[in-house]
């Protein structure tokens, strides 16, 4: 739920350099419902932990993995979830879920205007555990799509 501009401003104001930024997007569920829970279970693999931050009327709640978030879910609270499941940055949505791509776009716009770092790394490592319907293209094709999308966002010929 952090704002990329505020995070960069805070680090720079403290005199902390930013040697590298990892560019990745996660899943965003604006108002989690029981139907969302059923659908997101497709993303609950046994390979990686997928931490969840839930924003409720009571504040932020953090869960070490999707299963923990499922167990604590209360539909009446209508929480917003951010799920640490790296999804392709070129996708604005997956299976009806939005992604945190707007934060990536915000950061890359800032990077294009006023360089924050010399080292950008596109970091999607979950290709093999994405639900089957999102694995139509091979990994190399998808990585190329991500790199091209990032370059377009930078708009100045920079390469991530």
Regions flagged by a language model, labelled:
Residues 1-78, 82, 87:
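Acidic/histidine-rich catalytic cores of soluble enzymes
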Residues 14-16, 157-160:
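Secondary-structure transition/capping motifs at alpha-helix termini
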Residues 61-158:
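Flexible, acidic glycine-rich loops studded with aromatic residues
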């Amino acid at each position: 739920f952090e704002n990329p501009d505020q995070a960069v401003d805070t680090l720079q104001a403290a005199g902390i350099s930013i040697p590298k930024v990892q560019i990745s997007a996660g899943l965003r569920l604006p108002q989690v419902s029981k139907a969302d829970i059923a659908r997101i279970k497709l993303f609950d693999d046994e390979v990686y932990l997928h931490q969840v931050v839930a924003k409720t009327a009571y504040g932020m709640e953090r869960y070490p993995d999707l299963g923990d978030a499922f167990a604590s879910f209360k539909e009446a609270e209508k929480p917003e979830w951010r799920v640490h499941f790296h999804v392709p940055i070129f996708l604005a949505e997956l299976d009806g879920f939005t992604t945190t791509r707007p934060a990536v776009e915000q950061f890359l716009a800032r990077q294009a205007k006023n360089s924050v770092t010399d080292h950008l790394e596109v970091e999607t490592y979950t290709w093999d555990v994405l639900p089957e319907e999102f694995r139509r293209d091979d990994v190399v094709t998808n990585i190329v799509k991500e790199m091209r999308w990032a370059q377009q966002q930078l708009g100045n010929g920079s390469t991530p």
